């Protein structure tokens, strides 16, 4: 969500090096968390970044269930990025510990600085039923989805708008259904390395099922420890439909160039 602010920070740090070296640091993090929305930007080609954290949902009065949403990202080209989502659940009310449904996606930025769409990208993804329905860690369905992403900078405030559609595979003999998601996410610098994010998001029912629509508000600070490391924490408060309130905390860390790490590993083995 604060990718724009971080790119600006990287440019400021690079300014004394001269005009020819004002390109953003390839290790500058591109945080997609903590918001539900993602942005249109991508990790630098050949670089590896991981996002992880803990989220506690208030399942019952006095009880919370905890999960660790984790996303691994690899920059493929200047405009494409491979995502691997591997959620992990801790034992709690209505769920056992274990790995949830794994998903793979490819973010492809199609436009830069468009007059209407801003930085525009598409993110097709597939979710596999690797979790357990019985243990409460998975849906038991194979899902296909695509997210349209429009990112803007409005006088230093970053705005990310997402619209997603998912075709939910039928479980056993049941028919497939459809799911949608909308998000409007905002981020702005507060002071120094401290920024703040705020987001509205919702899941309207479109398939005629009895599943109620939901909507919620997310907000909290983020702190850029270094160009390659960003921290976040905050709250999620529902205002429509049946969904739990939640607290979260997490980290985004760019681990650097995959090729460079491979070369270092080879050198260490040959010594």
Predicted features along the sequence, with ranges:
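N-terminal secretory signal peptides that target proteins for export/translocation
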Residues: 1-4
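Bacterial N-terminal signal peptides
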Residues: 7-16
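Transmembrane beta-barrel domains of Gram-negative outer membranes and organellar outer membranes
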Residues: 20-271
């Amino acid at each position: 969500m604060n990718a724009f602010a971080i790119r600006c920070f990287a440019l400021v740090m690079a300014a004394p090096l001269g005009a020819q070296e004002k390109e953003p640091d390839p290790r500058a993090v591109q945080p997609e968390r903590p918001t539900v929305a993602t942005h249109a930007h991508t990790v630098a080609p050949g670089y590896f970044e991981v996002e992880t954290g803990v989220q506690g949902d208030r399942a019952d009065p006095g009880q919370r269930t905890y999960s660790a949403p984790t996303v691994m990202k690899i920059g493929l080209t200047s405009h494409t990025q491979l995502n691997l989502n591997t959620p992990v659940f801790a034992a709690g009310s209505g769920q056992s510990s274990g790995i949830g449904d794994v998903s793979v996606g490819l973010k492809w930025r199609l436009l830069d600085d468009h007059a209407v769409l801003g930085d525009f990208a598409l993110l097709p993804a597939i979710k596999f039923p690797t979790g357990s329905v019985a243990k409460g860690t998975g849906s038991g369905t194979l899902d296909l989805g695509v997210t349209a992403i429009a990112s803007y900078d409005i006088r230093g405030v970053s705005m990310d708008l997402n619209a997603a559609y998912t075709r939910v595979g039928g479980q056993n003999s049941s028919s497939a259904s459809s799911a949608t998601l909308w998000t409007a996410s905002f981020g702005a610098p507060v002071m120094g390395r401290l920024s703040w994010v705020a987001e509205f998001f919702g899941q309207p029912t479109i398939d005629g099922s009895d599943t109620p629509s939901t909507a919620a508000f997310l907000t909290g600070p983020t702190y850029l420890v270094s160009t390659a490391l960003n921290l976040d924490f905050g709250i999620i408060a529902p205002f429509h439909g049946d969904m739990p309130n939640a607290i979260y905390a997490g980290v985004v860390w760019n681990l650097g160039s995959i090729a460079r790490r491979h070369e270092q590993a080879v050198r260490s083995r040959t010594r």
